[in-house]
Curated annotation (Swiss-Prot):
It holds the Pfam family Aminotran_1_2. It is an enzyme of class 2 (transferase). Homodimer. It catalyses: L-histidinol phosphate + 2-oxoglutarate = 3-(imidazol-4-yl)-2-oxopropyl phosphate + L-glutamate. This is Histidinol-phosphate aminotransferase. Keywords: Amino-acid biosynthesis, Aminotransferase, Histidine biosynthesis, Pyridoxal phosphate, Transferase. Pathway: Amino-acid biosynthesis; L-histidine biosynthesis; L-histidine from 5-phospho-alpha-D-ribose 1-diphosphate: step 7/9. Its cofactor is pyridoxal 5'-phosphate. GO terms for molecular function: histidinol-phosphate transaminase activity; pyridoxal phosphate binding.
């Protein structure tokens, strides 16, 4: 066997396909509207901006390793026990910590066919095997998940609402899923878009976490709170899970600006409600306009839409993406999520929303 001539990553790392974010720029186009990352067009709360500026006056100090001010704000506004809250440098870090804590080679996780790519990446990084199950009509299929559970299953990941479809699983179905899982299997409910949902049969997961030992709810400040640049995520979980994750968490994983701005953002309920109202107005308008153009739109409860294009080559999603990009509108290609002929569009500023509709009207002539 030939000796390696340089350090080698552990087995399996080079088999992982790196996450590919949405594009940010279009060559030769000066003015672009980035509608590919589900960022809020209203931006963060003014109070969060002020807290961020104030945090800049103390950069010589280490942040609070427990992120106490942020956890306190989350606990107070959500009616939760602060001891059951763990904050991280974005939900991605927390997903990684969960997988490092609970997965080993030979273990399996279950993800759905259109699920968030990071679930698979972090599963593989931990040396475990992701098992993909089918969805039904662009919705999570509880029966398919339960049928996929084996003696090796350790974690089940579901995004609710789901990305990139924008669909959701009613709480009774989530409850049925949990009831069908063995007690040692961890159910992770990724509720990144929960604040946008205004449906009586939806619940983000607080109730299940509070009454069980094997459920984790994950949330983010990157969507409705408008702070993706600061990377703030949090989980609500049983104490034994929080304790285990804290044992391998970095001692200062949250920076001071993120702690301060996040605490201010989640306390500003008026800004959240303003963002919800804006989104509901334009989500409905965009859905109606795209449908009028003859495009199928997956019904969404989030701040984005999955737009399906005709089968003819001249009007495919790839052609539409090229057409829109040349006009300064960046949408998200979702072929990697199992939708080769669809684009995902964030609800953006009014001028961008109207501009995309006008551009697609011309494209489809």
């Amino acid at each position: 066997m030939q000796k390696p001539t340089r350090p080698q990553p552990k087995a399996g790392v080079l088999d992982i396909a790196a996450y590919v974010p949405g594009k940010e720029h279009v060559e030769g186009v000066a003015k672009v509207y980035k509608l590919s990352s589900n960022e809020t067009p209203l931006g963060p709360s003014p109070h969060a901006r002020e807290a961020y500026r104030h945090a800049g006056e103390k950069l010589e100090l280490y942040p609070d390793g427990q992120a106490l001010a942020l956890r306190q704000a989350i606990a107070e506004t959500q009616g939760l026990n602060i001891s059951n809250i763990l904050c991280g440098n974005g939900s991605d870090e927390l997903l990684g910590l969960l997988c490092q804590t609970y997965l080993a080679p030979g273990d399996e996780t279950i993800i759905t066919e259109h699920g968030f790519a990071v679930y698979k990446i972090q599963t593989l990084a931990a040396g475990a095997t992701p098992v993909t199950v089918k969805e039904k009509n662009e919705r999570i299929d509880v029966d398919a998940i339960l049928a996929g559970v084996t003696a090796r299953t350790k974690i089940v990941f579901i995004a609710n609402p789901a990305n990139p479809t924008g669909t959701y699983l009613p709480f009774e179905e989530v409850r049925r899923l949990h009831a069908g899982l063995p007690q040692h299997v961890l159910l992770v409910l990724d509720a990144a878009y929960a604040e946008y949902v205004r449906r009586n049969d939806y619940e983000a997961g607080l109730e299940l976490v509070s009454s069980n030992e094997n459920v984790v709810m994950m949330r983010t400040f990157s969507k409705i709170h408008g702070l993706p640049g600061l990377r703030i995520g949090w989980i609500y979980a049983p104490l034994h899970i929080i304790d285990a994750m804290n044992r391998i968490r970095g001692p200062f994983n949250m920076n001071s600006a993120a702690i301060a701005a996040g605490a201010a953002a989640i306390r500003d309920r008026a800004h959240v409600e303003k963002s919800v109202a804006y989104n509901e107005k334009w989500l409905a308008w965009l859905t109606e306009e795209f449908t009028r153009l003859g495009l199928r739109v997956t019904p969404s409860v989030t701040n984005f839409l999955l737009i399906h294009f005709p089968d003819d080559a001249a009007h495919s999603a790839d052609k539409a993406d090229e057409w829109l990009s040349r006009r300064g509108y960046i949408l998200r290609r979702v072929g990697g999520y199992g939708f080769p002929n669809a684009l995902r569009m964030t609800v953006g500023p009014e001028e961008a929303n109207r501009g995309v509709v006008a551009a697609l009207t011309e494209f489809l002539k």
